[in-house]
Amino acid sequence: MHVDDIGDPWTVADATSWVAAALGETEWVQVGALLRTDFPASTLEALAAGRRRLLVDAQGLVRLARVGPLARDAYIDPSSFRSLAVLKLNEGEARILAGGVEPEHLRALGVPEIVLTLGSAGALLVTDSHAERIARVPVEGIVDPTGAGDSFSAAYISARARGAAPVEAARAANALAAELISTA
């Protein structure tokens, strides 16, 4: 992947004006940044104002904001996690941000709900008091993983918005992502 240009970051003014108007009474918001500078911590806090809960995909948190080949590193402003309800990350992102994929590594990030996607091995849900492996869902046919993470995140917050517990939401998200990547 290659970054050709870097746009302006989302600002607190964006989050408190036109974005707030567009969101209205929305309770759950999915944030999927391309680069770590797309949503500064202050903007995430503004997006989480009131009763909104944020799910942030970690892919943007580990990507450097520079033109050229996509590069990743571990530096992240710890305040970026302060306003998150859910952090969704894959194994590579977990190793970069948390130093590992074990529940204790993930809990150290301080996010109430963390969902670690494990590709064909399922997922791992980690909360302050609980960790549960989400079983893999068999996939038939040729697999195209394009959009699997975004689909997982959308299904997770959709289930949570309907009142599902985190583990139920993770199971639903895992099932939907498996269905969407199969071309059978």
PLM regions: where:
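Residues that form generic nucleotide/phosphate-binding pockets
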Residues: 22, 97, 180
